[in-house]
Amino acid sequence: MKSGDILGETALLEALKAVGEPTRLRLLRLLAHEELSVMELVRILNQSQPRISRHLKLMNEAGVIDRFPDGAWVFYRLSEHPALTPLIDAVLTALGDEQSADLRALEEVRGQRLDAAQGYFENIAPVWDQIRSHYIDDAEVEAAIHSLVGEDPVETIIDLGTGSGRMLSLLAPRAQYAIGLDLSQQMLNIARARTREAGLTGIDFRHGDILATRLNGQSADLVVIHQVLHFLADPGQALKEAARLLKPGGRLLIVDFAPHRLEVMRDEYQHRRLGIGDDDMGHWQKAAGLQSMRSLSLPPHQEPGLTVRIWLMHKA
């Protein structure tokens, strides 16, 4: 057994004390479902923010959960320390699903997130590309995408969170068949019109959740997730779904913002995360069973601006 897999008596006792309280057990169960912000946990448990923060601090200090700030928000998730994971799993198994009220409240929070994001996209769909162009140089990003992906033809491309269909307009000409998936019907309408105008055929646009697509597994040569992950509560699940869709040897292309401090992106544009860091991406990639190929950064040409990160991965 590796030394990192051994917790030690003192740390074990601290971890047991950290979860040995009713509210902290409820927090542990909720964080087993997904990472959550402090204010989301406050709403779900219907307790004061200072009280919830105090419990989270104790659990974080004991190592059973991890704290990570993101701009003005703070998120928490279960620890993945190899010595603590068996203990956390055992506690969760013993707990079962007794707190169904908490899970119902979690679903309400998820629904509120989804409604806010969908409402935003329905409202801004007609001017989505203009909004994006305020922060990034599309031509430079698209040239980098072409460079990374190459010009070789592929059989099937799937664009998760296709939005206005820009990525399919760019990449679908090299594919025999392409699918664009999005939760916003208004966005899909624009994507259909855009690709039809461009004379592109063989593209199927579908309404659906990119975290659970219901598409056939091992069906895609290339999956694209373009400027989507920063909207998601669980980006790792999007990578897992992409990995499920990929054929062996298939590739995943991800484009998103690097970490930044522009709170306006959260306040006005419904971004849940202020960019995506390499550490998080590496964690999600590993959990999805994907292997890194290349990545690059495209800094802004003017301020305030956002650096764009592009990652290319493949499925062994």
Range-by-range predicted roles:
Residues 2-6, 82-129:
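Amphipathic alpha-helical dimerization/coiled-coil segments
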Residues 7-50, 74-82, 144-146:
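N-terminal helix-turn-helix DNA-binding core of bacterial DNA-binding proteins
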Residues 136-155:
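Conserved alpha-helix/loop element of class I SAM-dependent methyltransferases that forms part
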Residues 158, 164-212:
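Class I SAM-dependent methyltransferase SAM/SAH-binding core
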Residues 211-223:
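A short acidic, Gly/Pro-enriched loop at the edge of an enzyme's catalytic core
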Residues 221-234:
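A short SAM/SAH-binding and catalytic strip from SAM-dependent methyltransferases
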Residues 236-251:
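A short glycine-rich, Lys/Arg-flanked "PGG" loop and its adjoining helix->strand segment in the class I
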Residues 251-307, 311-312:
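C-terminal alpha-helical "lid/dimerization" subdomain adjacent to the S-adenosyl-L-methionine
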